[in-house]
Amino acid sequence: MKEFDADFYAAMLNTAIVLGYWEKDWKTLRATFDLLHLSIYLCFDVFAKNTARDFSNYLEKDIDAYDHPYPGIRMYYCEVAIADLLIKIKGDNERIRELIYSGFHAIIAYERQALEKEKYRDSYFAIAGTQKGVRHIRGLINGWNEQVEKYSHYSYIPIYKTDKVEDLLYFVGEDGEFLH
């Protein structure tokens, strides 16, 4: 839970900083958000490489075998936090969706072109789409929501709480391929 809190806070803080570019031209704003997404990716890329974690050892090991969630899970819920904050502040509209899609596209393009990752299972996001991954994400989000009341007594600012996640769809099999 501590990592979820720290990751979520970092994603929200960086998004708030980048929102300072809102009045800039569209090209600058989009490039700035792409850089935000790429910087989060690169951060979790370092964690993944330093801990030698990949798709196969995530599926083989117990979720609690490590003291930190898998980097792809952490990156995924940070991206969700960014999208959620954008929508809450600027509304759910075409421009916001374009910013979010652009950030994901920047990550995918970086993985495919710069890192030459050929298969989806090689992407850090792949884990988040597995049955085990969605259960893990749901557990982290709902677990955090249960802790908010406890920690709010120690906080100087309101603690961000998300809606309860009842269910998430998984779309990646244990082989790393998309389910049909």
Residue ranges of predicted features:
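Short helix/loop segments within enzyme catalytic domains
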Residues: 1-55, 81, 92
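Non-catalytic terminal regions of proteins
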Residues: 27, 55-180
